[in-house]
Amino acid sequence: MALTPTFSRAPDIAPAPKGIIDPATGRPIGANDPTFLSINDELADRGFLVTSADELINWARTGSLMWMTFGLACCAVEMMQMSMPRYDCERFGFAPRGSPRQSDVMIVAGTLTNKMAPALRKVYDQMPEPRYVISMGSCANGGGYYHYSYSVVRGCDRVVPVDIYVPGCPPSAEALLYGVLLLQRKIRRIGTIER
């Protein structure tokens, strides 16, 4: 007896997703969330959502931040670790770029010396607006161990405006990822058009 495949003209229909059912109500969890209910009602009535252009631009910008590495010392190792598969910063819409002209965010990680300060400013000036800076680690925040050295800038905020400070020596990859999430929250709160 040979096995022959049977073909049917009826379409295969997947069962409706149930999600996680709340045993008290018998409905999916979050089914009575007022935010999702209003979005669902608006989509059902009109077929589209209405929002302001500023909110749409802020939403798109927070989901597509491109960062440029400016690793000056040992903090750069944690910055590289943040982009590896264990933490995977790209799932938050935070992807690395090699050129300042394609970057929205610059992460200054490490000790900034007086000789390197003009190069940092030059790279910052090449970034398109709106641009953001994350200062990572004690050395970038305020000089760190080398605060009293004649050749060290006591904080990169003396050269470029800093939006987020990530403390630590070196800060962990989780701390830097939290700083990225804080930057996204700041962009949503302040906006990009006013900046």
Curated annotation (Swiss-Prot):
One of its GO terms (biological process) is aerobic respiration. It is a peripheral membrane protein. PROSITE patterns: COMPLEX1_20K. InterPro entries: NADH_UbQ_OxRdtase-like_20kDa, NADH_UQ_OxRdtase_20Kd_su. It catalyses: a quinone + NADH + 5 H(+)(in) = a quinol + NAD(+) + 4 H(+)(out). Keywords: 4Fe-4S, Cell inner membrane, Cell membrane, Iron, Iron-sulfur, Membrane, Metal-binding, NAD, Quinone, Translocase, Transport, Ubiquinone. Binds 1 [4Fe-4S] cluster. One of its GO terms (molecular function) is NADH dehydrogenase (ubiquinone) activity. GO terms for cellular component: plasma membrane; respiratory chain complex I. Its EC number is 7.1.1.-. It is an enzyme of class 7 (translocase). Its main location: membrane. It comes from the Bacteria. [4Fe-4S] cluster binds at C74, C75, C139, C169. It is found in: Cell inner membrane. Its cofactor is [4Fe-4S] cluster. HAMAP family: NDH1_NuoB. Belongs to the complex I 20 kDa subunit family. NDH-1 shuttles electrons from NADH, via FMN and iron-sulfur (Fe-S) centers, to quinones in the respiratory chain. The immediate electron acceptor for the enzyme in this species is believed to be ubiquinone. Couples the redox reaction to proton translocation (for every two electrons transferred, four hydrogen ions are translocated across the cytoplasmic membrane), and thus conserves the redox energy in a proton gradient. NDH-1 is composed of 14 different subunits. Subunits NuoB, C, D, E, F, and G constitute the peripheral sector of the complex. This is NADH-quinone oxidoreductase subunit B. The gene is nuoB.
